[in-house]
Amino acid sequence: MASQNRRNFLKTAAFIGASAASISSVPTKAKTPDKLQESRMGVLVDTTVCIGCRNCEWACKEAHNLETDPLNTYSNRSILDIKRRPDEHALTVVNEYSNPKNQLIPTDVKVQCMHCDDPACASACIVGAFTKHENGAVTWDSDKCIGCRYCMIACPFQVPAFEYSKALEPNIMKCDFCFDRTKEGKLPACVEICPVEAITYGKREDLIAIAHDRIKRHPDKYINHIMGEHEVGGTSWLYLAGQDFTKLDIPVLGEDPAPGVTESIQHGIFAYFIPPIALYALLGGVMWLNKNKNKPEEVF
């Protein structure tokens, strides 16, 4: 009866493979996120006001229990000689650029997660470890993360950082918009400590109105562009500058949300986890055949 079982298995395996192929070949459409609150929060960064004190870096580390030196050491500007990116040790950094309008006063730019309205990191994550909250924040859940790092590839701003120093339980590190602080009615740590109010926290729609008003009143001071108002579908963090944003290492991005590409690829590959299931079924079948190939045929 072994041959009969083998025939049945082959028929079943063929059926599973065909079914899996037909299901996984159905085009998957990028999910539309839940409607965000019109009153969602944001931050306006005015790079013409920032003085590069880096107090925001210190406050961020303090708020997130990251190792840091005393605040008074951050006045050392020598670190600004190199361009840095947020990483596992610093969720926000400040970089310095030359100012074409005044060579004596550089342009300092704070860098962190932009908290996209339609985040590519969330769409690329196959286990739903990222959440876009109604108030605008994009957060990450360590309990769900499997360490695939697709979020790092998907992010148009190259922000998520991986804790390579932790071999067993690494985290994805990025700004969380001080989610726990703002839930309690507090300001984000970086906003609270800024001595010159270069970063302003408030309703995103109000911040956009403020930014447009500044541009209108001071056309010689600002370029006519609010970075983040429309880029990749809009971001919670917004920027004003006195020079082209490309000169400040801010990428040129279209207005279409980035998840349009990442979701169609990732969700197409992993839809229903059918391809992995089909693979496991096939491998199990091969093992069954090898185990039973030398058994004698049963005769009725």
Model-derived features: where do they sit?
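Iron-sulfur cluster-binding cysteine motifs and their immediate structural context
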Residues: S25-P33, N55-N76, L91-V94, D118-K144, ...
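Long, compositionally biased charged/polar accessory segments in the mid-to-C-terminal portions
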Residues: V196-F300
